[in-house]
Amino acid sequence: MAENAIKDVLKDVLKHTHSLGIFEMVKISGTGSSTEVETVDADKTVIFKGSMVNPVADFVDSTVGLSRMNVLDGYLKYPGFDSDVATVQVIKQSRNGVDVPTEVAFVDENGTDAHYRFMLADVVNAQLKEIKFKGADLDLSIVPSQKNLKDLAYFNGVLSAFESTFSPRTEDGKLYFYIGDAGGDRTKILINDAPNGQITHEFKWPLDVVLKILRLGDSAGIVMSINTKGLLQIKVSSGIGEYTYLLPAKG
């Protein structure tokens, strides 16, 4: 990868993890053919798995962790480090005879520098256990529109103080998102046609978190899928990475 290309990779990873405000750390593992990213929040509300479109040379045969992500995010957003003439590179050190990534070094054109330390592999592996997911059949998939996002955000603003979840259900060949329950304040929002899928169980997911994920990219690069066993999957493609968010239902 070109010099400073790591900056774009780190920005993209943080955008799709740290910006959601629910993940404490992220694990990055690489080989010569792939670079994988994964994490899960403390409550296991969202399981995150990502793969970079192109393998990242700095992480080949290595595993590192990102914690204190607000520090890394702050460095990446500093105008001096974000300029084309700044240098951003991964520094490696020898450990047990093997060169491993230990930090990211930032230097601007005036000589101002900053350093961000990675979590070592054994530390992140101990704190963020391997996330196993064998996959699942998905019964209904849609590409959310901008109108969907606006409608969901609007009614979330109206009802979130009283109801923080939503329930997707199909009715007469259409998919609706229900917020609130019978006997209280509620709304039913038309999302899309669903001629080939059927979701009738009243599974619930946190609307605020789902909205944050859906806002990560333009609607054309997002696919939302649901299965009848209570799994919501959102796939986001950024051009730099392909990211999958898995949300087990709450009820």
Regions found by a protein language model. Give the residues of each.
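DNA polymerase processivity clamps
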Residues: M1-Y116, L138-G251
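Short, well-ordered, aromatic-rich surface patches in folded extracellular/luminal domains
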Residues: T112, Y116-L128, K132
